């Protein structure tokens, strides 16, 4: 059965649905995976403290984070990235960057993709190598 218009296993928040995927992919492959799930599905974009909290709560209740200490310790991809040759961050779904919760927002040439930082219980964002393989969150609008 669908929850608030979301597919089974997805979490609803404010007209969007979020799904956590534990398989580890590069940022680009994760975005491609999300897009293949359906029209208008992308890596998650975050536009408010409330939306961020909803995602953090979902991660807290997702495997493998809740079961064993040594499993915890991975950042989780979201849809923020800096396209090649650009200086500005962009969401993969094309929405505007109007909220931030940076652990560090630094211009590191080789680090152009953003993940939720596990050491702060996913409360902050950090810049990572896009080729790093991490679990990820997909999102679609209902």
From Swiss-Prot:
UniProt keyword list: Disulfide bond, Extracellular matrix, Lectin, Phosphoprotein, Secreted
Record GO cellular component, one term: extracellular region
SUPFAM superfamilies: C-type lectin-like
GO function term, MF aspect, one: carbohydrate binding
Disulfide bond positions: 6-17, 34-138, 113-130
Pfam families from the UniProt entry: Lectin_C (PF00059)
InterPro entries: C-type_lectin-like (IPR001304), C-type_lectin-like/link_sf (IPR016186), C-type_lectin/snaclec_domain (IPR050111), CTDL_fold (IPR016187)
Localization in the cell: Secreted, Extracellular space, Extracellular matrix
Residues with Phosphoserine modification: 62, 66, 68
PROSITE patterns tied to this protein: C_TYPE_LECTIN_2
Domain C-type lectin positions: 13-139
CDD domains linked: CLECT_REG-1_like (cd03594)
Protein name: Struthiocalcin-2
Organism: Struthio camelus (Common ostrich)
